[in-house]
Amino acid sequence: TGSAFNQLDDPQSPLSVRIIYFEYDSSEIRSDYRSTIEAHALYLQQNPNTSIILEGHADERGSREYNLALGERRAKTVKQQMLLLGANSNQIRLVSYGEERPASDGHDDASWQQNRRVEILY
């Protein structure tokens, strides 16, 4: 394996996937993202001086307050999973933007799907 820098920048690495998408009104991790979360948790475990920010997001449906809480629940769920897999709590910061920072500005299912997410920032 190369240096940490190479691992994070390698498009073939599972670490290149930095967005976890969620179903409507859900903070449950979809099974197709478990291996992504596992890879990031392992990376954090192997690199104890590395830290990340988990940004929780929601689509525009629902109140602003509700969506901030939903974004936070999503980020917390990803953090809990990473902790169970060996990451350290002090390596992970959480922030929720709710509906404030959409990945897509549309007002349809395809856009909303892109906005229901947690982004992993190194």
Where on the chain are the PLM-derived regions?
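Extracytoplasmic/secreted proteins, especially bacterial periplasmic and envelope-associated proteins
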Residues: D32-A39, E65, A69, R73, ...
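A non-catalytic structural micro-motif
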Residues: P48-H57, E72-A103, R116-Y122
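Periplasmic peptidoglycan-binding/tethering modules of Gram-negative envelope proteins
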Residues: T1-S51
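Surface-exposed aromatic
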Residues: A58-S63
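Short beta-alpha junctions and helix-cap segments that line functional grooves
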Residues: D105-D108
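A generic structural micro-feature
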Residues: A110-Q114
